[in-house]
């Protein structure tokens, strides 16, 4: 059969890939659902089942209406194997969504230390003044009673259950400019969380944020199974 011929062709190639792969290296094999289960058996034999890492689902296209008797095929599989334990792997993160940026990071800080809320137009356009930093604020109150963390800081009273941080940590955060002080002593000190210091959500084994190449894309070279640069970048950055 065509599948047997394909697997017979793939087996020696996978063995050679395993041979030349560095001890810290990994293999990512892209395949569609018609062959992924057969290829996994081959890879388990070549790499060892203990070196299987993930079966990544890549959502490469949106749902279409040409499938009448089954669910439309919108995803492919990427089988991820390591050469052996100790392979290089770097956790990947998604970029922040527009909703996260709009709803959570609504303050700006300027080089002179002044801060203000973003305007409606700035939130809608996501265009902010040069050299400004976006941040949001986090409560510094302890969720549980902490008698040892009930102290006044720079004239500001502690929250009812105490601070979340020790006095030494408060001083360090203050030196780093990460405390936002209220206009009056009746307010509460807040922690500044800068956008440029926050990673997005951790990427899991279902990738929905990388679309397939379209004919209008500049990077398209005409190769039928060409992969998007964003897909290759994620794999390279991860391993």
Locate each region found by the language model.
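Core catalytic lobe of class I
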Residues: 1-239
């Amino acid at each position: 059969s065509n599948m047997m011929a394909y697997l017979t062709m793939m087996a020696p190639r996978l063995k050679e890939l395993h041979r030349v792969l560095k001890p810290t290296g990994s293999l990512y094999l892209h395949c569609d659902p018609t062959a992924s289960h057969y290829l996994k058996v081959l890879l388990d034999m070549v790499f060892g089942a203990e070196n299987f890492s993930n079966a990544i689902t890549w959502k490469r296209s949106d749902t279409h209406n040409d499938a009448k008797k089954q669910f439309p095929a919108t995803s492919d599989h990427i089988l991820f194997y390591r050469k052996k334990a100790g392979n290089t792997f770097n956790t990947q993160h998604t970029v922040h969504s527009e909703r996260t940026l709009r709803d959570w990071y609504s303050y700006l800080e300027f080089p002179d230390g002044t801060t203000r809320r973003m305007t409606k137009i700035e939130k809608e356009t996501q265009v902010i003044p040069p050299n400004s930093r976006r941040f949001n604020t986090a409560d510094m109150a302890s969720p549980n009673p902490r008698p040892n963390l009930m102290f006044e800081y720079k004239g500001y009273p502690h929250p009812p259950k105490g601070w979340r941080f020790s006095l030494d940590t408060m001083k360090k955060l203050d030196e780093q400019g990460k405390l936002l002080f209220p206009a009056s002593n009746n307010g509460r000190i807040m922690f500044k969380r800068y956008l440029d210091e926050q990673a997005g959500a951790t990427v899991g084994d279902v990738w929905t944020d990388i679309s397939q190449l379209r004919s209008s894309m500049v990077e398209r070279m005409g190769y039928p199974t060409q992969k998007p640069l964003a897909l290759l970048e994620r794999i390279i950055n991860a391993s």
